[in-house]
Amino acid sequence: MHELSRRNNAPICGKDFKTGQTLIKTILAPGFKARMIGLNGWFSTNILGNRDGEVLEDPGSFKTKEESKLSVLEHILQPELYPDLYGNFTHKVRINYYPPRGDNKEGWDNIDIFGWLGYPMQIKVDFLCRDSILAAPIVLDLVLFMDLAQRSAELRGLGIQEWLSFYFKSPMTAPGLYPEHDLFIQLMKLKNTLRHLRGEELITHLGLEYYD
């Protein structure tokens, strides 16, 4: 893919849209990390009855999906930097094909966290959603942004459009570069890239100018 991109001077950006359960993880996990809330375990199960669910019945296909889902928490929580909080959490992901559910996907999460003095707590999330309804707007956004990247000499020369990682479970990055999965950092990078292209001041949220 990288070679094709270089050969054709075409932009590339990522794999596997971030629409359901992984979207929720990339919203919640940065909050835990920001408040230094520890994590003992995160159990995730999915019920879906569309073609995606049928394909994921195959162990080989599920393995690829599982790897992209599992990697998100480690990249966000950085257990090597915060071993007392995130150095030993258990992360399980299950996907169940259930034809009566059709395109209506259910993502259920049990999250075991702990706070000050190690006191355990739990969070339960039951996300009942529609797979295609969540994915379709991403397709529309990416058509527009990839067209912009193709027309922009500055972006086209990059090849990998890391600024579009906001939309993906597996964003593409330059070789050896740490992939960013925090949804809010991804959104800031997306907005600032667009502002940079327009020659506008980048968003920092510093806010000191309000108190001059």
Tell me the role of every PLM-derived stretch.
Residues 1-10:
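Rossmann-fold NAD(P)-binding glycine/threonine-rich loop
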Residues 4, 26, 30, 138-141, ...:
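Alpha-helical scaffold segments in soluble metabolic enzymes
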Residues 6-7, 35, 51, 94, ...:
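Arginine residue identity/basic-tract feature
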Residues 10-92:
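Conserved anion/nucleotide-ligand pocket segment
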Residues 14, 20, 31, 38-41, ...:
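Residue-identity detector for glycine
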Residues 61, 65-154:
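C-terminal and late-domain segments of enzyme folds
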Residues 114-212:
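C-terminal active-site/capping subdomain that shapes the small-molecule cofactor and substrate pocket
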